[in-house]
Amino acid sequence: ALGYTAEMAIDEAQRCLNCKNPKCVNGCPVNVHIPEFISKVAEGKFDEAFGVITSTNSLPAICGRVCPQENQCEGQCVRGIKGEPVGIGRLERFVADYHNAHGHQGGAPTVPESNGHKVAVVGSGPAGLTCAGDLARKGYDVTVFEALHQVGGVLVYGIPEFRLPKAIVAKEVARLEHFGVKIMKDTVVGRTITVDELMEEQGFEAVFIGSGAGLPMVM
């Protein structure tokens, strides 16, 4: 799918009822402020909408494409009771793609000051990248260790190109690097370096292990 044009996005956003108690937010695993970002889209303030989304979601262009919205945010949309729910996922995708295409920075969160703490993230799949983004927003010095030569984990190795283009993943990763996230590829934690070495020799205070379950199990 090609996604929304600006006109289509505004029209779709205007369908939102801006519920007083938005169930869509409760259905979102990362608690994106959905009515707020949609209202910004309806006003044509796409950069501000991007800022709202990325205040809680580090991977909007990815989530807008592959999150199961029908069971999460859109599944809770009141509009869906008597018709089609608001296309929340497609609106999120539009906002992220618009931001990437136009290179705007006005709506993006500013790079926070360092809080002086170091955290290692093992694995650059969706869990690892999300963790890295959330920590970077809070001022942590984050380094992601990826065993393979390409960053993204299942996002690049398990999802076909037509569903999630690798260029989209690369742009999301580049934005995380803009916030100070460092990425070490071809580094197998447990072989190349151990968790103990990360903490005792390299000064990391915590390690998040998001290595995934991508390897087959031999019966």
Regions picked out by a protein language model, each given a short descriptive name:
Residues A132, A136-R137, V156:
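Gly/Ala-rich phosphate-binding loop of Rossmann-like dinucleotide-binding domains
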Residues Y140-V156:
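Glycine-rich FAD pyrophosphate-binding loop
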Residues I10-E43, F50, T54-I88, G128-T130, ...:
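Cysteine-centered iron-sulfur cluster-binding motifs in ferredoxin-type domains/subunits
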Residues A120, T130-D134, V142-V144:
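Iron-sulfur cluster-binding electron-transfer modules in prokaryotic oxidoreductases
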Residues Y157-I168:
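Glycine-rich phosphate-binding loop and adjoining beta1-alpha1-beta2 segment
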